[in-house]
Amino acid sequence: MILLFAVALVLPAFLWAAYVALRVATVGERDEPHPAHAVVVLGTREYSGWPSPPFGARLDHALSLYAEGLAPLVIVAGGDPEGDSYTEAAAGVRYLEHQGLPAEALLTVGGNNTYENLREVKALAEQESLESVLLVSERFHMLRSLVMAEDLEIQVYGSPTNTSPRDHNPALRFYYMLREVAAYTAYVLGLRNPTPV
């Protein structure tokens, strides 16, 4: 009886985790380089005003989408979750300007997690009459980001970077997959402020 009870508890959780992991993987492979009013880069760690390698990969991808003419603006999202003197958004803008992106093509929003970032993007889009966005992050992060954007009624297309070091290290890839399953589940359950990524 105890064994059956344990199976009844564990099996649904396992099936849910497997389902979410499959969706994370599937959506992360989907690239929709669709014309939009702005490219949105979701921030992640920065160090003393310069992006971490994963953040740099996101920014490089956004730069390539801008260079292809898919959007006239790049919005860099990210706050200051650790009390640094730079926000993630400011570090991203600094990097993109260093790569030659003109200042007039750059906008920033704050927020210390994905949902807050996208809520700020929604407000800016309404303010600037931006009807659609092309969202950039890493593969593992795309499902949750796109679902959140759609829940906020943002017209969104997804274009993940494929150059993040987290994608090319099997141990890191597995870790971030597990982390994303937990974060997506927390969001679905109504906990809208999962750990920033």
Q: In which residue ranges do the predicted regions lie?
A:
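A structural signal for short, hydrophobic/glycine-enriched beta-strand patches
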Residues: 20-177
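A transmembrane-helix-recognition feature enriched in membrane-embedded lipid enzymes
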Residues: 21, 170-197
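N-terminal membrane-anchoring alpha-helices
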Residues: 1-37, 197
